[in-house]
Amino acid sequence: MESTVATITSTLAAVTASAPPKYDNLWMLILGFIIAFVLAFSVGANDVANSFGTAVGSGVVTLKQACILASIFETVGSALLGAKVSETIRNGLIDVELYNETQDLLMAGSVSAMFGSAVWQLVASFLKLPISGTHCIVGATIGFSLVANGQKGVKWSELIKIVMSWFVSPLLSGIMSGILFFLVRAFILRKADPVPNGLRALPIFYACTIGINLFSIMYTGAPLLGFDKLPLWGTILISVGCAVFCALIVWFFVCPRMKRKIEREVKSSPSESPLMEKKSNLKEDHEETKMAPGDVEHRNPVSEVVCATGPLRAVVEERTVSFKLGDLEEAPERERLPMDLKEETSIDSTINGAVQLPNGNLVQFSQTVSNQINSSGHYQYHTVHKDSGLYKELLHKLHLAKVGDCMGDSGDKPLRRNNSYTSYTMAICGMPLDSFRAKEGEQKGDEMETLTWPNADTKKRIRMDSYTSYCNAVSDLHSESEMDMSVKAEMGLGDRKGSSGSLEEWYDQDKPEVSLLFQFLQILTACFGSFAHGGNDVSNAIGPLVALYLVYKQEASTKAATPIWLLLYGGVGICMGLWVWGRRVIQTMGKDLTPITPSSGFSIELASALTVVIASNIGLPISTTHCKVGSVVSVGWLRSKKAVDWRLFRNIFMAWFVTVPISGVISAAIMAVFKYIILPV
């Protein structure tokens, strides 16, 4: 399918090679440069999410880090691999022989095609819908051809292949991703100790990642790198050789180091440990005191984090902040104390504590115990999922903090809450449920879900879902007045009503050691994908512009070299689109469709790349965007049958369906203006 993208470029260059220069069409060249940059911007805002959407969603990289990496690899890929857009493509969408005597009309058609493709991709990015840039330019090309020469200029067989790709791409990629993730889950994730099997499989994973992506890049035949001169057997031999060499390096050097790192950072740290604590006696700095539940009724312990300087080190009660990861497991009641976080606008406690995170944010703690624990020993605590974006920061760093490491005052802001982390922040900080209800629960009505838990018949679990359902809050039943406390579920509880039992029905989380194993693998696959994307999809934006420029400079021929600066021009436009608007589609790919973990993200990336390589070589119509969406949905359904947002997937599929006609209509309208108004003059 990628070869189809360069149709306009190569065919326009070929049919105008012998034509006299059209210096009076300088205005059209300038207009083409402007529209091509807008088109590159739209490609960056939409298509780049294919590469780093899942990496951002799993939390292995931040959005800023993803933009930096994507900018580097997209630009380098466009310069090194994008030169293939000047090659001759014999099987195109339109019959260019019809334009032998009307080069002006074909140039106008190129401008129209770029305009139609850019407009629809920008609209799709605004709607946060990932679509195929290839299909956009194809639809726009058909649109201007229909206006210029009617149906006789269109090769409808190519359009049939596009329709087939709507179903072949997501289905084939989804099957392959599902098989890979099933194997990973069966042999690694579901083991009591996943580290041994994970370390054994690590060289295989790295070898497959390097081999598949190298073959994909070299098989494109980039002239600048000399890949066009490599025979098929040479490409296979180089790819396999590099894969084996990488596997040996990983087995002898990476695996031992990874094992030590896991033992040091994960296994040496208990899954539940105090994040901050204050000793009851300054002379016993290394002793941990416990607070009996019965004492709570007679005392009002208030926690405070102070600087470790003489006069400020007051003797206060111990306070343990307990974050339980994963599903509910019973623990001694004395280890779990009620927590409450006052709202940012109403922090009026005389004693407040603030824990400063490594990123500069502050978590404001304020504890109010009265009326929270009654004689029956009821308590409130929260469950935090391990695939959340702040998990490693909160567990692996804060639990090592010592008294006096950070200091806060009553004016400190709580940890910033936005659309993605509102409920997550509330859960980890212990915000009372009624505070959340007062703000948001009354907009659409409150919903509460009662889950059946063994040995806990009297407990009600109240789920606080962000749009991506990162976490839930757990609260015991205190009194009749609290029974009406419920939380608005932003992710549609209607699709999940009637569920009961373990949260594993919804999510299949990665253990910390598993996350460490797959983190760099997912980053590596994303970087390879971004590099290949820069080479392939730069032709969507710059292909028609290259042809216009070569025709204007009288250098168009079947063997004309593509100027590198034009490819870099397109790469810059793609990067700008990513930085300005890319987060919208990245959120859809990495968060909104289904929650992503490092293991599932790696399965999605690797299987998608393998699908594109295989399907392209055997002649099946394929689209990178459709493959990635199909993999995300397939793996998400395997991880949890109710975690996929099927309504969003339906909207994405409808966007695929209308991409070709909408971009074609826009292009046809612009072409009509050129043909009947501008060019006749």
Swiss-Prot record:
Where is composition skewed (Basic and acidic residues) in this entry? Answer: 275-295
Catalyses: 2 Na(+)(out) + phosphate(out) = 2 Na(+)(in) + phosphate(in)
List, in alphabetical order, the GO biological process terms annotated in this UniProt record.
biomineral tissue development; cell population proliferation; phosphate ion transport
List every stretch annotated Disordered: 266-295
Pfam families to which the protein is assigned, alphabetical? PHO4 (PF01384)
Expression induction? By growth hormone.
The way it spans or sits in the membrane comes to: Multi-pass membrane protein
Query: Domain text from the record?
Result: Region A does not confer susceptibility to infection by Gibbon Ape Leukemia Virus (GaLV) and Feline leukemia virus subgroup B (FeLV-B). Substitution of Human SLC20A1 region A by region A of murine SLC20A1 prevents viral infection.
Give the family, as the similarity comment puts it.
Belongs to the inorganic phosphate transporter (PiT) (TC 2.A.20) family.
What protein is this chain from? Sodium-dependent phosphate transporter 1
Species whose genome carries this gene: Mus musculus (Mouse)
Q: Which gene encodes it?
A: Slc20a1
